[in-house]
């Protein structure tokens, strides 16, 4: 598998490190404004089977154009897309395979599967999503928190509430509280709290290093490389991992 890494910040560097450890061939690194690596996708002239993108939303048009023109699958793990940009990704997926997720860890894929099963059973419980990240993270709430919120909304009629300071009223049963914590060097922590009468249930995922996201991105690349055009997500990553586990058993 020949991988192109698009975006060579902290995550891009870890993807390269993990790829080499797994024996995956990194044929190109594209880092806009870099003197050390290729500056633009248009300059790439080596074999590429799949692109792993940890860049920023401003580079999305060039990324989608590159994938479409060269018929190359894309793993898009960049965060902070607008609804319009997500729509552009979906449109492009009609022509090429695209895996898009704000979180590429298997643990979050598993957490989403647990929510799909648990949320329908929690009528009468108030649900809150709490996420914590390092002090340098700009967007809030995190893309992963939004992903979890969408999973909950799909199973219960709730509405995300992002602040309560200005609300002088009791919590409604249809509310889905969203909370963000920023500080220190926290890699990423997501908790879904189900608060009932006299009891609470918590589902929690904690990333202990960024390698978990690199491993997931490479697994996603391997998952979609031979797939038909379409939009793939964490559910596909979970299904693939489960299939491999069953084969080993």
Swiss-Prot record:
Q: Record's CDD domains?
A: DHDPR_N
Q: Where is the active site?
A: 133 (proton donor/acceptor), 137 (proton donor)
Which intervals of the chain form a coiled coil? none
Q: What class of enzyme is it?
A: oxidoreductase
Tell me its EC number(s), please.
1.17.1.8
Q: Can you supply a Gene Ontology BP term from the record? A: lysine biosynthetic process via diaminopimelate
Where's it found, cell-wise? Cytoplasm
Q: Which PROSITE patterns match?
A: DAPB
Q: In which pathway does it act?
A: Amino-acid biosynthesis; L-lysine biosynthesis via DAP pathway; (S)-tetrahydrodipicolinate from L-aspartate: step 4/4
Residues noted as binding (S)-2,3,4,5-tetrahydrodipicolinate in the record, renumbered to the chain:
134, 143-144
Which superkingdom, per the lineage?
Bacteria
Question: Where along the chain is NAD(+) bound?
Answer: 77-79, 101-104
Write down the Pfam families for this protein, in alphabetical order: DapB_C (PF05173), DapB_N (PF01113)
Question: Catalysed reaction per UniProt?
Answer: (S)-2,3,4,5-tetrahydrodipicolinate + NAD(+) + H2O = (2S,4S)-4-hydroxy-2,3,4,5-tetrahydrodipicolinate + NADH + H(+); (S)-2,3,4,5-tetrahydrodipicolinate + NADP(+) + H2O = (2S,4S)-4-hydroxy-2,3,4,5-tetrahydrodipicolinate + NADPH + H(+)
Question: What keywords does the record list, in alphabetical order?
Answer: Amino-acid biosynthesis, Cytoplasm, Diaminopimelate biosynthesis, Lysine biosynthesis, NAD, NADP, Oxidoreductase
User: Mind telling me which GO cellular component terms the entry cites?
Assistant: cytosol
A molecular function (GO) held by this record is: oxidoreductase activity, acting on CH or CH2 groups, NAD or NADP as acceptor
Chief site of localization? cytoplasm
* Family indicated by similarity: Belongs to the DapB family.
Under HAMAP family, the record lists: DapB
The role this protein plays is:
Catalyzes the conversion of 4-hydroxy-tetrahydrodipicolinate (HTPA) to tetrahydrodipicolinate.
Q: Please report the name of this protein according to its UniProt entry.
A: 4-hydroxy-tetrahydrodipicolinate reductase
This chain's source organism reads: Exiguobacterium sp. (strain ATCC BAA-1283 / AT1b)
């Amino acid at each position: 598998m020949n991988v192109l890494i698009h975006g060579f910040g902290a995550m891009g560097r870890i993807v390269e490190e993990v790829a080499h450890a797994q024996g995956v061939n990194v044929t190109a690194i594209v880092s806009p404004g870099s003197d050390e690596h290729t500056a633009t996708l248009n300059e790439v002239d080596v074999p590429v089977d799949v692109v792993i993108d940890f860049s920023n939303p401003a580079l999305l048009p060039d990324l989608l154009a590159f994938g479409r023109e060269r018929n190359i699958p894309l793993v898009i793990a960049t965060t902070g897309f607008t609804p319009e940009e997500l729509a552009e990704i979906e449109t492009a997926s009609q022509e090429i395979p695209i895996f898009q997720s704000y979180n590429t860890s298997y643990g979050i894929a598993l957490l989403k599967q647990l929510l799909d099963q648990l949320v329908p059973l929690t009528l009468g419980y108030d649900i809150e999503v709490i996420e914590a990240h390092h002090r340098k993270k700009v967007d809030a709430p995190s893309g992963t928190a939004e992903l979890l919120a969408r999973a909950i909304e799909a199973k219960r009629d709730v509405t995300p509430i992002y602040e309560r300071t200005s609300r002088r009223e009791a919590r409604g049963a249809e509310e889905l509280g969203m909370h963000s914590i920023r500080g220190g060097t926290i890699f990423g922590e997501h908790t879904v709290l189900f608060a009932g009468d006299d009891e609470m249930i918590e589902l929690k995922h904690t990333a202990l290093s960024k390698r978990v996201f690199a491993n997931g991105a490479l697994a996603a690349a391997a998952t979609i490389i031979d797939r038909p055009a379409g939009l793939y997500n964490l559910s596909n990553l979970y299904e693939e991992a489960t299939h491999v586990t069953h084969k080993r058993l």
